[in-house]
Design a protein with these regions (language model features):
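Phosphate-binding site of ATP-dependent enzymes
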Residues: 120-205
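Protein kinase-like catalytic core scaffold
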Residues: 109, 164, 210, 222-225
Length: 274
């Protein structure tokens, strides 16, 4: 396989992978046209790669499109597993919509900025003052019911399977479980119900590289979001396994669509006489 990468860090240990700096995209079109897979392109490169050059990308197109915006992500989750999505309301950020959502939500509730990560755009709303501060920061309104939890799960999905994960305990400052916001790692076993939900969502939505955040409420899993580019903290020795898992997945996907690899219906060397 000919592999081209736009992320040197995430593909460092993948064999025979040609790294290209993202800003040099258009000076390496010949290399890209010859690639079997283009790995970890930046979001702005997706349209020219997929629709212009007809290249296969990893992570998948769905991983990029769904993972780019929390509102779109939640809508996708609600289409395939609505019973596992916290009660959510979205609206434009205008005075009428803001007042309507404020009246509909019971305190406390959670408000999010649609394009944010690492817990930076997630707020616990406990008062009108909290709500007004949030309204000044977000282009669109995205609110969810507050779940009574003091930890959540980060479950890692690569290719077509769960490779591991860990619990994230709430930070000493409260509310946020993100490691970047003071959350603590706990390597207690992953609940089977949470793993099964990740498998269901990722398979249904064609996601092949993500860290899913799952909340458990009385043993029942709720999906919060996923991150296409997840951090490596908390993964321990799994970090050593990831390159091999990616390579195995790419090889299997390539084989599935290569007629020369089909022993029952191989591509003829010469035209078949009729």
């Amino acid at each position: 396989m000919k592999l081209v990468s736009f992320d040197a860090f995430r593909t460092l240990r993948l064999p025979e992978t040609h790294y290209i700096k993202p800003e040099l995209f258009f000076t390496h079109l010949a290399d890209l046209r010859e690639a079997d897979w283009v790995l970890f392109p930046e979001y702005w490169q997706i349209n020219p790669l997929v629709f212009g050059l007809k290249r296969r990308i990893f992570p998948s197109l769905a991983s990029y499109l769904i993972g780019h915006n929390k509102i779109e992500m939640t809508r996708a989750f609600m289409a395939v597993a609505p019973e596992h999505v916290p009660w959510t309301l979205t609206a434009p950020n205008d005075p009428t919509s803001a007042e309507r959502l404020w009246q509909q939500m019971a305190l406390p509730f959670v408000a999010k900025i649609p394009k944010s990560s690492m817990g930076e755009g997630v707020f616990l709303i406990e008062s009108q003052d909290d709500w007004q501060r949030y309204l000044k920061l977000t282009p669109s309104l995205y609110v969810q019911e507050w779940l009574p939890i003091d930890r959540d799960l980060r479950i890692i999905w690569i290719g077509d399977r769960v490779i591991g994960g860990f619990w994230r305990r709430q930070s000493d400052q409260g509310f946020h479980n993100n490691l970047s916001r003071g959350g603590r790692i706990d390597h207690s076993p992953l609940p089977e119900a949470a793993v099964a939900l990740v498998h269901r969502l990722a398979t249904a939505l064609d996601i092949n590289h993500a860290g899913f955040d799952i909340a458990m409420v009385d043993g029942y899993p709720f999906v919060l979001e996923f991150n296409r580019l997840f951090g490596n903290r908390g993964l321990g020795s799994l970090n050593n396994d990831i390159p091999g898992v990616i390579l195995d997945y790419l090889e299997r996907q390539s084989g599935c669509n290569d007629p020369d690899d089909d022993p029952l219906r191989p591509t003829p060397i010469w035209p078949v006489a009729i």
